[in-house]
Amino acid sequence: MSLIEFPLLDQTSSNSVISTTPNDLSNWSRLSSLWPLLYGTSCCFIEFASLIGSRFDFDRYGLVPRSSPRQADLILTAGTVTMKMAPSLVRLYEQMPEPKYVIAMGACTITGGMFSTDSYSTVRGVDKLIPVDVYLPGCPPKPEAVIDALTKLRKKIAREIIEDRTLCQSQKKNRSFTTRHKLYVRRSTHTGTYEQELLYQSPSTLDISSETFFKSKSSVSSYKLVN
């Protein structure tokens, strides 16, 4: 049996007969055999590759990496997702059979990371394209954090209800492309030259007069704490 706790698998008789439901039995079989589709585009994926070694041994969780989305039920996105890659990612997700799950690994996947401030081609979060079940922050996350994310996903699968999963399948048309990105053509601000007014400022803006300095210092020293 798995180490994941089940709400309905704790009723045993004196003859060691386990009373359960088909829903719990289905969840137990699925959480012990997750087949991930690895979608790594940056350095975060190297941390996930560390799980394959003997130190962490991710085979004990029943993970079998697949190269085809039609044979996978978990997609693990790691790294930056660009606008050009977005249609391919959504197509891979749509080709996965139900039920399917998503783990967003790393800051670049969750929020765009350091590329989200001045890059016009970076998707600000993979959840704008596909629904995410577990968020794994970090830059990059450690292998122990990846194992913790997999454990949380297994607990989520263990408590799923078939009716809720059927409702999500009926609303499949709303599960992807939740937010449309709008691109506007504007004048480029990266000209390759430095702003001279920022480098050579007048002394009046850089220097602080001694009178102002001692005035602020005396005001700080005269402040008293009141209990």
From Swiss-Prot:
<dbReference type="GO" id="GO:0048038">
    <property type="term" value="F:quinone binding"/>
</dbReference>
<feature type="binding site">
    <location>
        <position position="43"/>
    </location>
    <ligand>
        <name>[4Fe-4S] cluster</name>
    </ligand>
</feature>
<keyword id="KW-0004">4Fe-4S</keyword>
<comment type="function">
    <text>NDH shuttles electrons from NAD(P)H:plastoquinone, via FMN and iron-sulfur (Fe-S) centers, to quinones in the photosynthetic chain and possibly in a chloroplast respiratory chain. The immediate electron acceptor for the enzyme in this species is believed to be plastoquinone. Couples the redox reaction to proton translocation, and thus conserves the redox energy in a proton gradient.</text>
</comment>
<dbReference type="InterPro" id="IPR006138">
    <property type="entry name" value="NADH_UQ_OxRdtase_20Kd_su"/>
</dbReference>
<dbReference type="InterPro" id="IPR006137">
    <property type="entry name" value="NADH_UbQ_OxRdtase-like_20kDa"/>
</dbReference>
<dbReference type="GO" id="GO:0009535">
    <property type="term" value="C:chloroplast thylakoid membrane"/>
</dbReference>
<dbReference type="GO" id="GO:0015990">
    <property type="term" value="P:electron transport coupled proton transport"/>
</dbReference>
<keyword id="KW-0874">Quinone</keyword>
<dbReference type="GO" id="GO:0009060">
    <property type="term" value="P:aerobic respiration"/>
</dbReference>
<dbReference type="GO" id="GO:0008137">
    <property type="term" value="F:NADH dehydrogenase (ubiquinone) activity"/>
</dbReference>
<keyword id="KW-0813">Transport</keyword>
<dbReference type="GO" id="GO:0045271">
    <property type="term" value="C:respiratory chain complex I"/>
</dbReference>
<keyword id="KW-0479">Metal-binding</keyword>
<keyword id="KW-1278">Translocase</keyword>
<keyword id="KW-0934">Plastid</keyword>
<keyword id="KW-0150">Chloroplast</keyword>
<feature type="binding site">
    <location>
        <position position="139"/>
    </location>
    <ligand>
        <name>[4Fe-4S] cluster</name>
    </ligand>
</feature>
<keyword id="KW-0411">Iron-sulfur</keyword>
<keyword id="KW-0521">NADP</keyword>
<keyword id="KW-0618">Plastoquinone</keyword>
<keyword id="KW-0408">Iron</keyword>
<dbReference type="GO" id="GO:0051539">
    <property type="term" value="F:4 iron, 4 sulfur cluster binding"/>
</dbReference>
<keyword id="KW-0472">Membrane</keyword>
<protein>
    <recommendedName>
        <fullName>NAD(P)H-quinone oxidoreductase subunit K, chloroplastic</fullName>
        <ecNumber>7.1.1.-</ecNumber>
    </recommendedName>
</protein>
<feature type="binding site">
    <location>
        <position position="108"/>
    </location>
    <ligand>
        <name>[4Fe-4S] cluster</name>
    </ligand>
</feature>
<dbReference type="GO" id="GO:0005506">
    <property type="term" value="F:iron ion binding"/>
</dbReference>
<comment type="subunit">
    <text>NDH is composed of at least 16 different subunits, 5 of which are encoded in the nucleus.</text>
</comment>
<dbReference type="Pfam" id="PF01058">
    <property type="entry name" value="Oxidored_q6"/>
</dbReference>
<dbReference type="GO" id="GO:0019684">
    <property type="term" value="P:photosynthesis, light reaction"/>
</dbReference>
<keyword id="KW-0793">Thylakoid</keyword>
<feature type="binding site">
    <location>
        <position position="44"/>
    </location>
    <ligand>
        <name>[4Fe-4S] cluster</name>
    </ligand>
</feature>
<keyword id="KW-0520">NAD</keyword>
<comment type="similarity">
    <text>Belongs to the complex I 20 kDa subunit family.</text>
</comment>
